[in-house]
Design a protein with these regions (language model features):
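A local structural micro-motif
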Residues: 17-19, 49
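Phosphate-binding active sites in nucleotide-utilizing proteins
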Residues: 146-165
Length: 165
């Protein structure tokens, strides 16, 4: 299951690798608060600002953004005149402003700049991730292929054809 950090980078269309982002997220001491999310986004070059919107006017926000609800974080994707569309635990939801305002604390993490955002050493990490996936897939395929080739080349020795006669 993807973390909020992965979902947010997806919403921003920022390149990342699964291994690097999960290690960063799991090892971060503040992964469950806005400070930690901000610091992890800094690693990717996403400049963010933590704000408190006192009047809770959702239309004043830049989207996508991270919104703090009571005990959780959601990713605000877009805000219309009457509804807000957001992502919570990987599920997209649309709610009326009034319903969402009951759970939103007014705290948000908004993006200031993300045009050049990317994972540090992204190309190296991507190459390593592809190589790892290839090893994971190639070894079983080679094993199965060698069994099939071995059986085919020794079909007379096994006696399968003699049984069919």
């Amino acid at each position: 299951m993807k973390t909020i950090l992965e979902h947010f980078l997806d919403a921003l269309d920022v390149g990342y690798t699964r291994h690097f982002i999960r290690a960063l997220y799991q090892e971060h001491p503040h992964k469950n608060n806005m400070y930690g999310l901000k610091r992890m986004l800094d690693v990717y070059g996403v400049k963010t600002l933590g704000v408190y919107v006192e009047n809770k006017n959702l239309s004043e926000m830049n989207y996508p953004c991270i919104l703090h609800t009571h005990g959780d974080f959601v990713i605000g994707l877009e805000c219309g005149a009457e509804n807000i569309r957001f992502l919570q635990h990987g599920r997209e939801t649309t709610l009326a402003h009034d319903a969402f305002l009951h759970t939103w604390t007014g705290n948000a993490l908004v993006v200031q700049e993300a045009t050049e955002a990317v994972e540090p050493d992204y190309k190296i990490h991507l190459r390593e991730e592809i190589a790892s996936m290839a090893k994971t897939c190639i070894i079983p395929v080679m094993l199965i292929l060698s069994v099939v080739v071995g059986m085919a080349s020794n079909i007379n020795d096994i006696g399968i054809l003699h049984m069919a006669r």
